[in-house]
Swiss-Prot record:
HAMAP family: Ribosome_mat_RimM (MF_00014). Binds ribosomal protein uS19. One of its GO terms (molecular function) is ribosome binding. This is Ribosome maturation factor RimM. An accessory protein needed during the final step in the assembly of 30S ribosomal subunit, possibly for assembly of the head region. Essential for efficient processing of 16S rRNA. May be needed both before and after RbfA during the maturation of 16S rRNA. It has affinity for free ribosomal 30S subunits but not for 70S ribosomes. Residues 97-169 form the PRC barrel domain. One of its GO terms (cellular component) is ribosome. Its main location: cytoplasm. The keyword Chaperone applies. The gene is rimM.
Length: 175
C-alpha cells in the first residue's frame, strides 16, 4: 500500500511503559473514532509497514496509548518514536455532503462569485494557523483562506468549490 492510498493519522511521539507501549499523537478532531483499530501502517524508511494492535485507548484527549504485537520492550518502542502513522483511505469516516477531507478536493476548480473560475486547487496548506487553498491559474499561485465565510459551496459531483472572496484578494494575485 502506498501513501497515496492512505491518510495521515498521527505520529508516534513517546514510549509509555517498559512493556513496549507507545503514545500516538492523533491528527484528528475525533480521536475516539480510532480507539478500536486492529492495525495501522507505520512509516519506516519510506515504506509503510503494518503493525497489529493488541490494545489501545485514549490517553489525555488526543493521544492514543497503543501496544503493538511484537513490540515487547522499551527499546523496541524507542525505535518507533517520530514515525508517522497511516490508515487506508477506505477507513476514513463518511462525511456529510457539505463537508470534505482535504485530499478530496485536490484538482477541484474554484469558482469565485465575482471573478468566475480562478483556477484549480493543487494543494491545501495546513501548516499555518488558518488552512489555505493553494490554487494555480496560468502559472500563478493564489492563496485563499479555508474559512466558512469564504466557502459558499463544495460540489463534489461537479468537482468545484464556490467561494466569495474579500474585495481585492484575487486581484492581489492575478493583477
Amino acid at each position: 500500500m502506498t501513501k497515496e492510498e492512505c491518510f495521515y493519522l498521527g505520529k508516534i511521539v513517546a514510549k509509555f511503559s517498559f512493556k513496549g507501549e507507545v503514545l500516538i499523537k492523533l491528527d484528528t478532531d475525533e480521536p475516539e473514532t480510532y480507539t478500536e483499530m486492529e492495525s495501522v501502517l507505520v512509516e519506516y524508511n519510506d515504506n509503510l509497514v503494518p503493525f497489529f494492535i493488541e490494545r489501545s485507548y485514549l490517553h489525555k484527549s488526543t493521544l492514543l496509548r497503543a501496544k503493538f504485537e511484537d513490540i515487547e520492550t522499551e527499546e523496541d518502542a524507542e525505535d518507533m518514536i517520530g514515525a508517522h502513522v497511516y490508515l487506508p483511505l477506505s477507513m476514513l469516516p463518511k462525511l456529510p455532503e457539505d463537508k470534505f477531507y482535504f485530499h478530496e478536493i485536490i484538482g477541484f476548480n474554484v469558482i469565485d462569485a465575482e471573478h468566475g473560475n480562478i483556477g484549480k486547487i493543487v494543494s491545501i496548506n495546513d501548516s499555518t494557523a488558518q488552512a489555505l487553498f493553494e490554487i494555480e491559474k496560468d502559472g500563478k499561485q493564489i492563496l485563499i483562506p479555508m474559512n466558512d465565510e469564504f466557502i459558499e459551496k463544495v460540489d463534489k459531483k461537479n468537482n468545484t468549490v464556490r467561494v466569495i472572496t474579500p474585495e481585492g484578494l484575487v486581484e492581489l494575485y492575478l493583477g
